[in-house]
Amino acid sequence: MSTRLATLRAALAVTATLLPTAAWAHVGHGSTVGFVHGFVHPVTGIDHVLAMVAVGLFAANLGGRALWAVPLSFVSVMAVGGVLGVAGIGVPFVEAGIAISVIVLGLAVALRWQWPVAAAMALVGIFAIFHGHAHGAEMPVDASGLEYGLGFMLATALLHVVGIGLGIGIARFGRTTSPRVIQFGGGAMAVAGLGILTGVI
């Protein structure tokens, strides 16, 4: 357990180093608007929230280096997708890709996939393009692009941390029941993703 806690601390340290503090939001009006809108965008969409938390749960299930490498892969590739969105460079099937990400990542949690870290990083990276593009394409015209991007990157990283915290926290309650709770949650995410894909949600 001490090893897991040490790895989690390392993941938090990487997040703190990579992403900005709220001070970035006070450079000017455009910066404030950009950072706030960027931060709010991921947390106000159920599809984004479910996928981000699922990434954290997936990483927690894999453990070890995956605790920081998998979320870092998502945030990094998402930034590329965000640039594409801001630049108006099209990515096909963005909305479908986001919904499918909720389904697949939910299944990864529900079925407790034990993938190599590199494969898990590649999987989440594919889906990160869609999420990042959606964020970038919806940037307000009066927002600062840099601060907007930093805002949604920070919010995404925090949602990953929530997922990691849930995964590790629930695992402490018992080896028999805790995996089932996490698997049930993953299954619920996958079902929700199917609802998003079909337009029911």
Regions found by a protein language model. Give the residues of each.
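Membrane metalloprotein/metal-transporter helix-bundle signature
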Residues: 2-201
